[in-house]
């Protein structure tokens, strides 16, 4: 058994702490917020999207990005910048848009997602967590025939990875999401992913925090991390505003903020804060609300059903750590919600939110060892932190405890990036 410090209490940090504790370690979580999941995990899309696990870096994206720059409601926005970190990250992302790399990255992501599904299933079977979860799948809807044609390559990868799916016509889409009936003329079909789930990530995190406390995990909230202190290639402590915290091993699970903490150690990981937005609406008419998750392929916006709320989330914006919520981004999210489910939610009571998704240029998270003997990472999950959290945490616990995991062959640690090591 080792004493382990987990830095970060988002869904990835909390699940890391949980699985490390289950492996027999003495775990402490450190975070600057007053409780867990107060940042990127707070109001995300609510999707647990095993079948939708796919990198943003895909064939055709460079051409689409140029077109999106001229569109009012584009799914990708890039704020002009000469930031070297952004330019480097974008260059790496463009390289990963090649078909061969896309296929490798997507298959890797699907493997993590499928493993995570089994981990979350086992957790729920034991503890019956109540986070307004539903197991009714994801319906990816298409507005034009080109999208239907383009999805065929993804379907091949899904089949190879053992992910269940079904290509649907519009009438079949309505059997899963009858609330789309008033706008069915806007659709040409959909892809049904029956094994996907939904749930409020924030509620999950609060319940997991309490479970972890019962298992002996300690939490230092309102504690600001300043730097990692090392001797040679070993970490000897974490300097915080409350003093130096020491352990046998350290896990960096700080999302987009992992990069700045690791850089002084000579570790440069290509994780960039890709800004996302959400809108949460009270449901006013259940028959016109989504039943699970509807993913609008055109705008890359997800509409997810909680018990009495609709969570609308989307947009990828490259703008650094700017916390502002521009009116234009609000307009895009609200437009899609009104376009597909105009009578389902109370738009007058909608609440907007933004968060910084920690995204790698290849879409795959960075899980595992580092050049420092007792330092580990679990970060870079992008839009799929909720989807991959349990599986990633289990992989991390295996690597920290045994030196490897069943998925080590995928090359998930930072050593896949030459400059990082």
Curated annotation (Swiss-Prot):
Pathway connected to this protein: Amino-acid degradation; D-alanine degradation; NH(3) and pyruvate from D-alanine: step 1/1
Residue sites binding FAD per the record: 4-18
Q: Which reaction does it catalyse?
A: a D-alpha-amino acid + A + H2O = a 2-oxocarboxylate + AH2 + NH4(+)
Single Gene Ontology MF annotation: D-amino-acid dehydrogenase activity
| EC number, UniProt record | 1.4.99.-
GO BP, sorted A to Z: D-alanine catabolic process
Q: Which InterPro entries match?
A: DadA, FAD-dep_OxRdtase, FAD/NAD-bd_sf
Which controlled-vocabulary keywords does the entry list?
A: FAD, Flavoprotein, Oxidoreductase
Cross-referenced Pfam families, in alphabetical order?
A: DAO
Tell me which GO cellular component terms the UniProt record holds: cytoplasm; plasma membrane
**Residue ranges crossing the lipid bilayer per the database entry:** none
The source's superkingdom equals Bacteria
The prosthetic group or cofactor this protein requires is: FAD
NCBIfam families recorded:
PRK00711.1
Protein purpose: Oxidative deamination of D-amino acids.
> Hey, which family's this protein in?
Belongs to the DadA oxidoreductase family.
Return the protein name. D-amino acid dehydrogenase
Q: Give me the gene this protein comes from.
A: dadA
